[in-house]
C-alpha cells in the first residue's frame, strides 16, 4: 500500500533530504530484485509511484541527487549471475512513464515546444517482457544480450537461438544491432504453470517473470521448452535500414524476417492518441500476449536525434502505463489463514469477478490494522484491481452500497488451524500462533524447507507436501529423509520414475552446506544472508545451537533481535531432538568451505564494494575470496563502506567513494594483499 506523501512544497529541507535518501535506497533494492533476480518485491504501480515521487524530490532538491540514484541509472545494478557480460555498443535506455492523459499532454507540449511545431507520432503497444539486443553480422545472428544496467548486460545468445520467432539469419546480409522485447505468450504461460503445479512446483507469478527466468537459464533446453516469443522495435543504426521514420523501421524489420508487432499507428494529433489508448485498454485481454501500456514515439528519426536523450531516458519517446483494471464485487466472507511463522492473515472471499483476464475470488487483507483502515465488512461492495496486473487487491469500500445487515469482521482469538490461543507480539501488526505443532505452520514450514533457496528439493512443492502430511508420511523436516519410493507410489500422480526422482532429490539435499539447512529450518528473522553469516562464523549446527545471544549478535550484520530468535529456537527440546534426527539421517550439519576464516585478516569485518572490470580475477571469485576472509561484500557505497576496490572503467561507485572519503584500492593493491594473506 502506498504511503500518504506530504506535499513537496511543505517539506523542510531536512525532511526532503531524509525522504530522498530513503527512496533512493529503497528503489535500488526494488530495482535489483526486479531486473537481476526476476523476483519483484513490490507491484509495478507501487514502484512507479515511488519512482515518480523521487523524481519530483530530486527536481526540487537537486543537491540531494547522487550518482547511484535510480534516476541516474538504467535498469539493475551490476549483474551477478554466471552468464557472461556484454558491453552494449550504445546504452540500452529505459522509457519515461506517464500515468494519465494530462501527463501525456504535458509531455507533448514540451516536445512540441522543443521542436518548434507538432510532429507526427508513432504509437506502439508496450509489450510486457524482457528487453533484448540482437546483433547480426552479414545477416547471421552472432550475439544476444539482456539490458542489464543499460551499459553492460548478459550474454544469452545460446538461449535466444532456441526461440523460433527470432531468425538466426536475416533475409539480407546486413550487419546491424536491433532491440526488442522477449515475452511469453499467454497460452504458453498458462500451460507452463499448469505443468508446474502438476509437478508440485510453485507457479510463476506472471508472464514477465516467467519469460525473464526462462531467458536467463544456464540450461538452454529449459529455455527452448518455454515457448518464448519476441518483437523487434528499435535500432540505433537506422542508416543501415535506409529509413527516415520509426514506422518505416518497423516495416524494414519485417522485410528482414524479424518479428514485429503490427498494431502500430502513425498519428498527427493528440486526440488520436487518446483514441488509441482507449481502443487497446478495452482490447488488451483479447491479445495473445501481455501489454501494460502504449509507447508514443516521435516518428521522424532526424527529430529524435534533435531531441536526444537524458542519461536515463530518450526525450523523443514516452510510455503511457495503463491504470490497474478495476471491477466491483461483494465481500462474502473473511477467512483467516496461518503462515510458516505463525502469522495469521485475513483473506477476503468475494463473488467471482473477471479481472485482467482471470477469475478472481480472493484477495489478501494483510493484517487486522489494514482491515480497520479499509473499514471492510462482510457484505460490502468493494473495488478490486490487480496490483501490477498480478495480485488481486481491494481498493476501497463503496459505503453507499453497504447493506444494513453487513457484518463487522471478527478478529480471531484462537488459531483457525490448531485452535491454540493467538498472541499479539509488541511491535508487530500481525496476530501470531505460537504453537510449534500447528498443522498449518508445519505444512508451510516443510514447503519452505524444500524450497529452492533452502534445501532445494526439486519436485517437493506445496501440493506434494500436503499429500505427504495427509498420508501421515511426514510430520517434521527430519521425517522428509525417511520417505520411501513405496510411500510415494500411494500418492496421487506419482509413478515409479517421478517417485525415484524425488527420493534422489531428497538424498542430494543431504549434502547441502550448513547455511542452506539453517535457512531451511525457518527460524524467525533468519534469511538466507543471515544464515550464511552465521554458518561462516560457527561452522557447525551444534556450535550454532550452543551459542549465546552475545556470541551471535557480535557477528557483523546480525543484530540482537535475530540473535535472540536463534537462541530461543534452539532452546526447545523439540529443536534439539530435530538436530539429532537430521544427523542420524545423514544430513550435513557443517559449513562446506575449504577456508577457515582468519579473524586476524585485514578484511575481517570490513564492508567492501567491488566496482569496474577486474582483469586478474572474475567478480564472483573475488567476492568469494573476500567473504572467505571475513568481509561483507556489498553492492553499493555508503558512509558505512570501509573499502572500494576499483577495476577498469569504474563508474559512479568510485565517484561516490571519493565524495564520501572512502578508501579506494586499485585491483593491483587488492591482488598484493591477497598474496600477503594467502602466504600467511
From Swiss-Prot:
The active site is at 126 (n6-amp-lysine intermediate). Keywords: DNA damage, DNA repair, DNA replication, Ligase, Magnesium, Manganese, Metal-binding, NAD, Zinc. NAD(+) binds at residues 44-48, 94-95, 124, 147, 181, 297, 321. One of its GO terms (biological process) is DNA replication. The keyword Zinc applies. This is DNA ligase. HAMAP family: DNA_ligase_A (MF_01588). It holds the Pfam family DNA_ligase_OB. Residues 598-680 form the BRCT domain. Zn(2+) binds at residues 415, 418, 433, 438. Its cofactor is Mg(2+); Mn(2+). Belongs to the NAD-dependent DNA ligase family. LigA subfamily. The lineage of its organism: Bacteria, Bacillati, Bacillota, Bacilli, Lactobacillales. It is an enzyme of class 6 (ligase). InterPro entries: BRCT_dom (IPR001357), BRCT_dom_sf (IPR036420), DisA/LigA_HHH (IPR041663), DNA_ligase (IPR001679), DNA_ligase_AS (IPR018239), DNA_ligase_CS (IPR033136), DNAligase_adenylation (IPR013839), DNAligase_N (IPR013840). GO terms for cellular component: cytosol. Its EC number is 6.5.1.2. It catalyses: NAD(+) + (deoxyribonucleotide)n-3'-hydroxyl + 5'-phospho-(deoxyribonucleotide)m = (deoxyribonucleotide)n+m + AMP + beta-nicotinamide D-nucleotide. GO terms for molecular function: DNA binding; DNA ligase (NAD+) activity; metal ion binding. DNA ligase that catalyzes the formation of phosphodiester linkages between 5'-phosphoryl and 3'-hydroxyl groups in double-stranded DNA using NAD as a coenzyme and as the energy source for the reaction. It is essential for DNA replication and repair of damaged DNA.
Amino acid at each position: 500500500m502506498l504511503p500518504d506523501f506530504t506535499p513537496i512544497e511543505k517539506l523542510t529541507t531536512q525532511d526532503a533530504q531524509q525522504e530522498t535518501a530513503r527512496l533512493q535506497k529503497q528503489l535500488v533494492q526494488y530495482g535489483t530484485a526486479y531486473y537481476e533476480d526476476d523476483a519483484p518485491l513490490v507491484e509495478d504501480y507501487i514502484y512507479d509511484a515511488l519512482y515518480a515521487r523521487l523524481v519530483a524530490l530530486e527536481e526540487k532538491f537537486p543537491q540531494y541527487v547522487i550518482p547511484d540514484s535510480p534516476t541516474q541509472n538504467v535498469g539493475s545494478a551490476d549483474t551477478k549471475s554466471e552468464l557472461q557480460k556484454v558491453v552494449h555498443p550504445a546504452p540500452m535506455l529505459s522509457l519515461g512513464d506517464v500515468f494519465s492523459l494530462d501527463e501525456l499532454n504535458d509531455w507533448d507540449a514540451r516536445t512540441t515546444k522543443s521542436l518548434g511545431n507538432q510532429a507526427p507520432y508513432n504509437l506502439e503497444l508496450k509489450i510486457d517482457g524482457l528487453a533484448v539486443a540482437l546483433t547480426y553480422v552479414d545477416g547471421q545472428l552472432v550475439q544476444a544480450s539482456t539490458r542489464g544496467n543499460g551499459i553492460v548486460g548478459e550474454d544469452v545468445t545460446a538461449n535466444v537461438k532456441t526461440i523460433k520467432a527470432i531468425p538466426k539469419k536475416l533475409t539480407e546480409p546486413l550487419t546491424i544491432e536491433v532491440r526488442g522485447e522477449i515475452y511469453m505468450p499467454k497460452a504458453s504461460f498458462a500451460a507452463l504453470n499448469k505443468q508446474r503445479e502438476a509437478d508440485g512446483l510453485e507457479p510463476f507469478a506472471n508472464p514477465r517473470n516467467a519469460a525473464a527466468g526462462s531467458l536467463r537459464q544456464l540450461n538452454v533446453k529449459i529455455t527452448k521448452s518455454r515457448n518464448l516469443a519476441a518483437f523487434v522495435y528499435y535500432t540505433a543504426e537506422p542508416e543501415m535500414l535506409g529509413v527516415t521514420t520509426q514506422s518505416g523501421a518497423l516495416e524494414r524489420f519485417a522485410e528482414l524476417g524479424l518479428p514485429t508487432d503490427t498494431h502500430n499507428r502513425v498519428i498527427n494529433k493528440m486526440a488520436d492518441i487518446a483514441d488509441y489508448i482507449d481502443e487497446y485498454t478495452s482490447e488488451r485481454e483479447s491479445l495473445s500476449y501481455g501489454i501494460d501500456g502504449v509507447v508514443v514515439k516521435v516518428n521522424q528519426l532526424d527529430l529524435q536525434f534533435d531531441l536526444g536523450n537524458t542519461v536515463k531516458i530518450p526525450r523523443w519517446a514516452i510510455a503511457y502505463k495503463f491504470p490497474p483494471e478495476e471491477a466491483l464485487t461483494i465481500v462474502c466472507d473473511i477467512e483467516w489463514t496461518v503462515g510458516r511463522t505463525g502469522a495469521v492473515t485475513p483473506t477476503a472471499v468475494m463473488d467471482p469477478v473477471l479481472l485482467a483476464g482471470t477469475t478472481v475470488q480472493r484477495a489478501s487483507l494483510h493484517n487486522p490494522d489494514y482491515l480497520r483502515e479499509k473499514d471492510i465488512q462482510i457484505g460490502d461492495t468493494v473495488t478490486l484491481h490487480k496490483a501490477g496486473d498480478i495480485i488481486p487487491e481491494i481498493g476501497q469500500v463503496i459505503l453507499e452500497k453497504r447493506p444494513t445487515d453487513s457484518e463487522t469482521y471478527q478478529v480471531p482469538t484462537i488459531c483457525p488451524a490448531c485452535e491454540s490461543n493467538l498472541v499479539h507480539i509488541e511491535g508487530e501488526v500481525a496476530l501470531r500462533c505460537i504453537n510449534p505443532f500447528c498443522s498449518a505452520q508445519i505444512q508451510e514450514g516443510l514447503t519452505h524447507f524444500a524450497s529452492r533457496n533452502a534445501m532445494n528439493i526439486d519436485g517437493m512443492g506445496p501440493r506434494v507436501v500436503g499429500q505427504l502430511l495427509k498420508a501421515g508420511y511426514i510430520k517434521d523436516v527430519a521425517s522428509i529423509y525417511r520417505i520411501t519410493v513405496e510411500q510415494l507410489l500411494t500418492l496421487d500422480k506419482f509413478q515409479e520414475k517421478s517417485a525415484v526422482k524425488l527420493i534422489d532429490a531428497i538424498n542430494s539435499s543431504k549434502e547441502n552446506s550448513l547455511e542452506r539447512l539453517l535457512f531451511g529450518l525457518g527460524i524467525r528473522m533468519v534469511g538466507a544472508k543471515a544464515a550464511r553469516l552465521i554458518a561462516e562464523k560457527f561452522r557447525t549446527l551444534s556450535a550454532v545451537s550452543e551459542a549465546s545471544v552475545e556470541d551471535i549478535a557480535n557477528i557483523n550484520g546480525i543484530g540482537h533481535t535475530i540473535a535472540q530468535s536463534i537462541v530461543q529456537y534452539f532452546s526447545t527440546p523439540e529443536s534439539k531432538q530435530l538436530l539429532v534426527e537430521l544427523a542420524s539421517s545423514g544430513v550435513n550439519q557443517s559449513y562446506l568451505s575449504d577456508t577457515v576464516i582468519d579473524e586476524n585478516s585485514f578484511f575481517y569485518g570490513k564492508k567492501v564494494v567491488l566496482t569496474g572490470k577486474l582483469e586478474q580475477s572474475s567478480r564472483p571469485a573475488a567476492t568469494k575470496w573476500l567473504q572467505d576472509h571475513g568481509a561483507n561484500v556489498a553492492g553499493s557505497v555508503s558512509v558505512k563502506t570501509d573499502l572500494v576496490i576499483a577495476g577498469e572503467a569504474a563508474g559512479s561507485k568510485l565517484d561516490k567513494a571519493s565524495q564520501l572519503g572512502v578508501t579506494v584500492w586499485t585491483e593491483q593493491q587488492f591482488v598484493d594483499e591477497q598474496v600477503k594473506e594467502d602466504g600467511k
